[in-house]
Curated annotation (Swiss-Prot):
Belongs to the poxviridae VETF large subunit family. The gene is VETFL. One of its GO terms (biological process) is positive regulation of DNA-templated transcription. Its main location: virion. Acts with RNA polymerase to initiate transcription from early gene promoters. Is recruited by the RPO-associated protein of 94 kDa (RAP94) to form the early transcription complex, which also contains the core RNA polymerase. ETF heterodimer binds to early gene promoters. Heterodimer of a 70 kDa and a 82 kDa subunit. Part of the early transcription complex composed of ETF, RAP94, and the DNA-directed RNA polymerase. It comes from Myxoma virus (strain Lausanne) (MYXV). Keywords: Activator, DNA-binding, Transcription, Transcription regulation, Virion. It is found in: Virion. GO terms for molecular function: DNA binding. This is Early transcription factor 82 kDa subunit. The keyword Transcription applies. GO terms for cellular component: virion component.
Length: 711
């Protein structure tokens, strides 16, 4: 999702609140006639041609700083009053009604504020409209004032607008609300809530009211699972995210809008225990996590002793920076504030911390090449700077010349590089592909062999773009995230397992693939990037995708053997990759990709049952693989406005021992709950009552033989 910085509106009015100037501010520099601001301007104020300024009011300013900025923007030096039709800004009444200097009621006591704009004006990120009036034109001229602008704010705004067009504002956001209250809901209140959920939002939300005691488990809703609590109401949205959860005494609320909509006729007492929001924002383009600010920015951030942690100016928002994501913790919910602060971080990173450009590599006294291009005793890989071209050199392109003994590359600054190895080995000029792929920087390096056949050489010398779908023959070591054009080795243990007896030939002195008739490697998935951060994420992904996934040294299978597909995934730094077979002929550059030999790992599945029908009646079958209706699996979500109940059980030693060989293969966040669920389902399927039936093992051996081992 690409974040769009919304336009802002400044209205300068005269007597009678007549608008004499309408300033439309936007960092894009053009008017967006589809924006809510323009709709308000054209429809409600009947202004269709406002002044368009490439400017931006920082939402982190205090009201006094904002007033100084507005005075400078409007080029006025007299006392003014600033206000808004949506929120109180500079002044407010005791009863918090909206202040308007042209409709002032003396009976109400005015309170002056110098708070931060985004706190005082909660919709500021989406819809900021500020009215400015000359104090002498109002009935309360004594309340007006003038502020000088902070020049540092103008300097920052100028720098921000300079880099704005180049900012990558694509981001993916995950949020976690920590709104926890004490309540008086109890069981009766929870029953009312789930009844409303089932009546009005049953198709959109999943819900479960769960109550248990020593003997029975009672369930109501449309998502039937076991929990570890005696009493619990949980509601999930369509993405499987918990919207709110309560045990009757406390409640955790993630979706405030949904929860409040259910309270129309419920007398609820709530006492806040904790309230904040944590956002995790994943960036499309990496940033420098350790920000160093070159100008005064205290009106935006407060720097801390840890240089990857920032605080907002009011110290109520904390920001933790990492290379590929930002974590933002907000004390109170403010619409889209996390996107706005992410925008500011990306902008500041671009202003002050951008990776140095190629010109920095041309100064002899500060030359730095990566570790793979340094001189050693027997290798001279770092190119030298030469002052001129030899007479016998031929022009290959505008920036590359060669003779029978030497090659010269000329960078964008006119600096000439050549490879003059005293041992006469590393004489060919090439380029470091990692710098070009990441930053489009052509950093020369010296090689043993001619590099003119490489993609990076073609890009730097002939300005040809690298085809992103062509696989690079260099095989990365396992552990790095694999991009579209790369492949990497499997972890050692799985490399040995998948590639036992398979021959692979590499180029001399490196890991460039030369030839193989079929070798298992890792490549990126062709689909969108998929992140799995928790065990729950992994389990859900495997069961939904119905394919095998490897994470660290564990192989995750779908629950049913018959569901296992033909793809094999592997997790690297929380990102899903896939295992494939590559083939390459020595005489060809192309690398062919084929599906993996999935049967190698599928045969490791610990529980392979025979399909056995337990009961059958009127086209319905209860089997060891599930419940079938007319031969098809019954997978319709069940829903109940009534209470369904089953016997509660403890885990008898006999059953636990019988299934223990199977349970050791189950990967779950709550092993005891999984075992309990398994046993309840098994007893229900087989029609066994633990209190009455003492001859259990023979029945288990019939349908689940050999103590849960493979059959």
């Amino acid at each position: 999702m690409r974040y769009v910085v919304n336009p802002q509106l400044v209205l300068y009015v005269e007597k009678g609140q007549k608008i004499k100037r309408a300033l439309y501010l936007t960092p894009y520099g053009t008017l967006d006639d589809k924006s809510p601001i323009y709709y308000f301007l054209s429809t409600h104020l009947k202004i269709t041609d406002p002044e368009v300024h490439k400017r931006h009011i920082l939402l982190t300013l205090k009201i006094s700083q904002l007033k100084g900025y507005l005075c400078d923007l409007l080029r006025i030096r007299n006392d003014v009053i600033i206000y808004s039709h949506k929120n109180n800004l500079e002044y407010s009444y005791v009863d918090n009604t909206i202040f308007n200097p042209f409709a002032h009621t003396q009976k109400k006591t005015l309170i002056k504020s110098d708070g931060f704009l985004y706190n005082i004006y909660p919709d500021a990120c989406d819809f900021l409209v500020i009215w400015v009036a000359d104090a002498e034109d109002t009935s309360i001229a004594e309340f007006g004032s003038y502020e000088d602008v902070d020049v540092n704010i103008l300097k920052f705004e100028t720098r921000l607008l300079e880099v704005f067009d180049d900012l990558d504002l694509d981001m993916t956001i995950e949020s976690k609300f920590n709104n926890i209250f004490r309540t008086n809901l109890k069981f009766t209140g929870l029953r009312k809530l789930i009844k409303k959920i089932n009546e009005f939002n049953g198709s959109r939300y999943k819900s479960l009211l769960y109550k248990s005691d020593e003997y029975f488990i009672n369930l109501t809703g449309n998502k039937f699972i076991l929990t570890d609590e005696r009493l619990n109401l949980t509601v999930w949205d369509s993405d499987g995210v918990v919207t709110f959860s309560s045990d009757g005494d406390t409640i955790m609320i993630n979706n405030v809008k949904l929860f409040t909509s259910l309270l129309t006729d419920i007398d609820l007492q709530m006492e806040r225990i904790k309230g904040d929001v944590t956002y995790k924002i994943f960036l499309s383009t990496p940033i420098t996590s350790r920000i160093k600010l070159n100008i005064e920015t205290s009106f935006i951030f407060v720097e801390t002793a840890t240089n990857n942690i920032l605080l907002s100016a009011d110290k109520r928002i904390s920001i933790i920076l990492a290379k590929n994501h930002i974590s933002i913790k907000v004390k109170n919910y403010i619409p889209n504030i996390e996107k706005y602060f992410t925008f500011l971080v990306i902008a500041i990173n671009s202003m002050f911390n951008n990776i140095q450009q190629a010109s920095d590599f041309t100064k002899v006294e500060t030359v730095y090449w990566s570790r793979i291009c340094q001189n050693t005793k027997n290798k001279h890989r770092k190119p030298v700077i030469v002052s001129s071209l030899d007479e016998d050199m031929e022009k290959v392109s505008d920036n590359f010349y060669k003779s029978s003994t030497k090659e010269v590359f000329i960078n964008s600054s006119g600096i000439m590089f050549s490879c003059l190895d005293p041992l006469n080995k590393y004489n060919y000029v090439g380029f470091l592909s990692i710098f070009y792929r990441l930053q489009k920087m052509c950093i020369p390096c010296c090689f043993l062999k001619n590099q003119s056949h490489t993609e990076t050489f073609s890009s730097c010398v002939y300005q040809k773009e690298i085809a992103s779908d062509v696989i690079n023959p260099y095989i990365l070591n396992f552990g790095k995230v694999v991009t579209k054009s790369k492949i990497s080795f499997l972890p050692i243990i799985f490399d040995s397992f998948f590639n036992e007896g398979v021959k692979i030939i590499f180029e001399q002195d490196n890991k460039r693939l030369k030839e193989t008739i079929g070798y298992h490697v890792i490549k990126s998935c062709d689909e969108d990037i998929k992140r799995l951060r928790t065990i729950s994420d992994i389990i859900a992904f495997v069961n939904e995708d119905k394919n095998i996934l490897i994470a660290e040294d564990i192989i995750y299978f779908p629950m049913n053997y018959v569901d296992i597909g033909t793809r094999v995934y592997i997790l690297i730094q929380e990102i899903v990759h896939e295992i494939v077979v590559v083939k390459k002929h020595m005489s060809k550059d192309a690398i062919e990709v084929f599906p993996p030999n999935y049967k190698l790992v599928k045969n490791l599945f610990p529980r392979q049952t025979k399909f056995i029908t337990i009961r059958s009646d009127s086209g319905m079958e209860l089997t060891t693989d599930g419940f079938l209706v007319d031969g098809k699996e019954f997978n319709v979500d069940l829903s109940s406005n009534y209470v369904a109940f089953t016997k509660n059980i403890t885990t008898p030693y006999t059953l636990s021992k019988y299934f223990s060989p199977l349970f050791k293969y189950a990967i779950t966040e709550s092993k005891n709950r999984f075992m309990k669920t398994w046993l309840i389902n098994t007893m229900l399927r087989l029609g066994i009552d633990l209190d009455l039936d003492t001859n259990i093992l023979p029945k288990l051996e019939k349908y689940y033989p050999n103590h849960g081992k493979s059959v």
